[in-house]
Amino acid sequence: MQQLLSPTISYPSPLFHLTSHPFPPKPHFCPTHRLSFYPPPKMASFSGFLAKSQMGMTAAAAAGDGANGFSSLMDYVGKGGLDVGDDLLVLLYHIQFACKRIAALVASPFNSALGKHSALTGATSGAAASDRDKPKPLDIVANEIILSSLRNSGKVSVMASEEDDAPIWINDDGPFVVVLDPLDGSRNIDASIPTGTIFGVYNRLPELDNQPTEEKALLNSLQSGRKLVAAGYVLYSSATILCASFGSGTHAFTLDRSTGDFILTHPSIRIPPQGQIYSVNDARYFDWPEGLRQYIDTVRQGKGKFPKKYSARYICSLVADFHRTMLYGGIAMNPRDHLRLVYEANPLSYLAEQAGGKGSDGKRSILSIQPVKLHQRLPLFLGSLEDIDELESYGDVQQKVNPGYEV
C-alpha cells in the first residue's frame, strides 16, 4: 500500500500510432487491473505557474506547499487537501483517467474510425470479433471506456448510464454507485462544438444487498439528488476542464497536456446571485407557455428585478452552456421535458447548489425530486439563485407541447 502510482505509466497501444508520423502522440490508457492508489509525486509545469499568475496570485502564493507552483486534482482532494477518503480518491482517479482518454478521442482527426479499436471486453473470435470491427458512435465508445475504468477501480457496485437501458451491476463489494452521461452533445462533434461528460456518485445502499441483482441495481440508481456524495462534469473544448464537488464547494481543474494532470484553476466557484445572460433555444418561443415568454420578454428589455438588458448565449451543448453560466451567472435552461433527471439534472443541480446557485424544474428544486424511472425526463433550469427565483415567480414556465423537433 506504500507504493506510489505514477500518472505517467503507459502501455503499448494500437491507437493513433501512424508509421508515417515522426512524433506519434502519447495516448492515455485505462489501468487494466485494480490498483492501490496514493497521490502521485508532484511534477513541475510551466503552465501551472502561468495558470496561477493569470489568477492574480503572487509568486509566493503560486509556489504553494511545494516547488511545483500548482495544485493537481489528486493533490487537492487527497490527504493534504479535502481528504475525500481513500475509496473516493481511487474512484476519482479512474474517472479522470477515462475522461482524459475520451478527450483524446474527441479531439482526434481519426475519431470516425475509432470504434473498431474500442472493444474492451476481450472477445477475439466469432460474431463478437466481427461486431467489434464495426465503427461505433463516439458516445458508445465513451460509455465503454468509462465502464472499463469503473470496473478496474474496484470501487463501484453499479453503473447507470444514459446509453444503457438498465443499470450494470459491477461489483458486490463496491461502495459507490455511479450515474453518468458519457458524452453529452455528441451530435455536435463533427462541427467541433464543445461536448462533455456528466457524472454523479452515490453511496451503495447496503439494505438492498440481499435483493435480486437487477432490483438492487435499479433501486441503488434511483436515489434522490440530495444523497449525492460527489458530482462533476468534464468539458471537452479549447481546454479540457473537470469541474467537481464533494460536498464542500465546487472546484474546476484544467488539463495540463504537458504533464497529464488536471490543475486547479477555479477554486470555490461562486455563481453570481444574478447574471445578465439567458441560454435557451428561443427559436421555440411560440411553443413556450405564457409565463416563460413573459419572463424572457421582461429580462431582455431590462425590466426585470435586475435592471439591465439580458443577452442570449446558446451553444446547444448542456455542459458548455452550464459551464459558462457557472462562471458568469444567469440561466441555462431547457423548458421541455427533455433532460434526464438521474444522469444530467441531478449532478448539475448539485454542482449549482454547491456554488451558491440553483437547479429547478420550474416549480421545485431538482434535488428534492425522487426519481421513479431510470430514464425519467423533465424540464431543467440552472443558474443564479435570484434569476431562478424570479423565473419561478412567473408561474407556468414548463413547455407542455413538443412539436417533434430534435434539438
Residue ranges and their predicted role:
Residues 1-30:
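N-terminal chloroplast transit peptides
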Residues 40-113, 140-407:
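IMPase-like, lithium-sensitive Mg2+-dependent phosphomonoesterase catalytic core
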Residues 108-125:
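Membrane-interface helix-loop junction between the first two transmembrane segments
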Residues 117-118, 128-132, 185, 338:
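Short, surface-exposed loop/turn segments at secondary-structure junctions
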Residues 120-133, 141-148:
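N-terminal, Lys/Arg-enriched amphipathic/low-complexity engagement segments
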